[in-house]
């Protein structure tokens, strides 16, 4: 769990420094991106739920929202429920005091009575206060989460619901090139297409590989070419 909170709730917030709104390539998701940015900049509470298959950019958008408000000195919280084994449901208590609460991978608590009730209670407290922005992600629409608590499924279905559309191969190439540009180097189109052809096309894998190639090119003082990529990745 990652928090940047008032003193009484103080825990450090660690966010990937490269997962911001500026580095997010929206593809066919400009409406979702605009909705999240609007929610972040509004002074009152709001709720957005968006879903996609794993690796579709869900966490990136939550990290970006946290970073945006955290940089403004606001109190924010990010809870990755796929890692809930490392904390307990009581961590959600008091989060209605924060400016932004991001709940990632809510599908992971399906069937867990304690976590479902804790999430249900947090949702209700946030609605009552009317101040907190709430962003929740899942791997499917709220009504298909197989939650054991029907009232929680109903609450999750009340807000703005979006499907995070996957990127096409051309859009993945542009996302990689944007990532490279923000890191200060160029990814030639032929190299990008080679990576898409030879590697797992899941974006997290592609970004990790791009970072690896960036470090290797700096060390070797060479530009990214297909022969160099083959050498570094043993392809």
UniProtKB/Swiss-Prot annotation:
GO terms for biological process: DNA replication initiation; negative regulation of DNA-templated DNA replication initiation. SUPFAM superfamilies: P-loop containing nucleoside triphosphate hydrolases. It comes from the Bacteria. It holds the Pfam family Bac_DnaA. The keyword tRNA processing does not apply. InterPro entries: Chromosome_initiator_DnaA-like, DnaA_dom, Hda, Hda_Enterobact, Hda_lid, P-loop_NTPase. Keywords: DNA replication, DNA replication inhibitor. Coiled coil: none annotated. Belongs to the DnaA family. HdA subfamily. Mediates the interaction of DNA replication initiator protein DnaA with DNA polymerase subunit beta sliding clamp (dnaN). Stimulates hydrolysis of ATP-DnaA to ADP-DnaA, rendering DnaA inactive for reinitiation, a process called regulatory inhibition of DnaA or RIDA. The active form seems to be an ADP-bound monomer. Forms the RIDA complex (regulatory inactivation of DnaA) of ATP-DnaA, ADP-Hda and the DNA-loaded beta sliding clamp (dnaN). This is DnaA regulatory inactivator Hda. It comes from Yersinia pestis (strain Pestoides F).
